[in-house]
């Protein structure tokens, strides 16, 4: 689905899923995903959203305020946050990024351990397979008619 969010450019798209009760109970599951092209000044603020966010910056830069810290995420980097915490991000320049919101199993219980030991900012060169999986998830949602949970 093409987005009309303020600050997004043509070619931006996103997809939502409604997982089954079994998926919620037993799996990690996709909630939404997308590929955005944005202009300088695109921003997003939430006090609470019940899902996890994995966002990869392909081009440009995003500034993120999260857990009392400010981060600059540049091309080739990604952030991973628990959106149950207040967060704000914006693009101080044109930007291209991919994202997924997901949930399930013990996401919110294990995240504090990840954040404590590694923070929320990572580089693609350290996790190239994650970026390929992210792009594949978005491609499947864009091109395939039916998505299964299996």
PLM feature spans:
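A generic helix-loop boundary/linker signal
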Residues: 23, 44, 124-127
